[in-house]
């Protein structure tokens, strides 16, 4: 190909690319995930391993039990990428963790501990931002933790407990920030609106209790004796051979009936205005 012809082709290609514009170029990339869980899982991988002393320092600082130091600032700064991924994930509507809840009491929930770690980092970073006068960013991190609590969901009781814990921790930091920030009517109006939006869609225990009832009814069967022993031992209860020998259908039937009435009573209480 002659040099001048090659130049004309190159020039035409450049003009065509400029005509498309940057928006068209971006469309060449695959779309970002629309499932928050996938982004959270990436944030987990970005968590930097810490020594026990560093973990304790960050946790205590996030709760307002320790003053900000250069060491804490540096430690939290290592989580910049994990924080950004968490903030992005918290803004997404859909969050499906892909849990194998059909395994019942054997289902693993490894994401819960990781979410607690992420939330501690976010709340620690919120306090750092507040110390630097970046109040909007500080509140945004607290709101992100509250949204993470929503994403934890209400599939099982332990999930609801973790969600409540995260929400409570975020509220504690928000309260501390409100007590320290300068007067800012616009900021308060924005925060009030954000909190109202989050409060409009609360987690509920209805589906959670039904799931727990179903799992318990299926698990408390003679053929699941070994699983039951494993569950009790996992809670720190030692089962003696004599106790194992006493586990029969009659005993389990009484326990199923007791548990069923127990769950029903809780549902009645929760449904009472």
Locations of regions flagged by a protein language model:
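Short acidic linear motifs
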Residues: 2, 7-9, 16-273
């Amino acid at each position: 190909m002659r040099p001048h012809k090659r130049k004309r082709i190159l020039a035409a290609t450049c003009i065509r690319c400029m005509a498309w514009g940057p928006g068209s170029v971006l469309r060449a990339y695959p779309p970002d995930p629309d499932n928050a869980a996938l982004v959270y899982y990436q944030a987990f991988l970005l968590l930097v391993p810490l020594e026990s002393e560093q973990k304790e320092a960050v946790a205590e600082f996030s709760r307002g039990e320790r003053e900000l130091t250069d060491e804490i600032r540096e430690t939290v700064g290592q989580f910049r990428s994990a924080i950004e991924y968490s903030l992005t994930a918290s803004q997404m509507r859909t969050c499906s963790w892909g849990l194998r809840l059909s395994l019942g009491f054997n289902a693993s929930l490894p994401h819960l501990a990781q979410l607690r770690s992420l939330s501690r980092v976010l709340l620690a970073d919120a306090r750092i931002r507040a110390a630097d006068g970046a109040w909007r960013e500080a509140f945004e991190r607290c709101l992100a933790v509250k949204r993470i609590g929503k994403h934890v969901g209400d599939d099982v009781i332990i999930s609801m407990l973790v969600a409540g814990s995260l929400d409570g921790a975020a509220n504690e930091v928000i309260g501390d920030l409100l007590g320290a920030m300068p007067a800012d009517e616009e900021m308060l109006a924005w925060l009030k609106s954000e909190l109202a939006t989050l409060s409009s869609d609360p987690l509920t225990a209805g589906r959670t209790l039904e799931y727990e009832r179903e799992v318990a009814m299926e698990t408390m069967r003679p053929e699941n004796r070994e699983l039951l022993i494993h569950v009790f031992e996992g809670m720190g209860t030692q089962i003696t051979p004599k106790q194992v020998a006493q586990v029969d259908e009659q005993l389990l039937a009484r326990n199923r009936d007791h548990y069923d009435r127990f769950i029903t009573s809780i549902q009645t209480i929760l449904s009472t205005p």
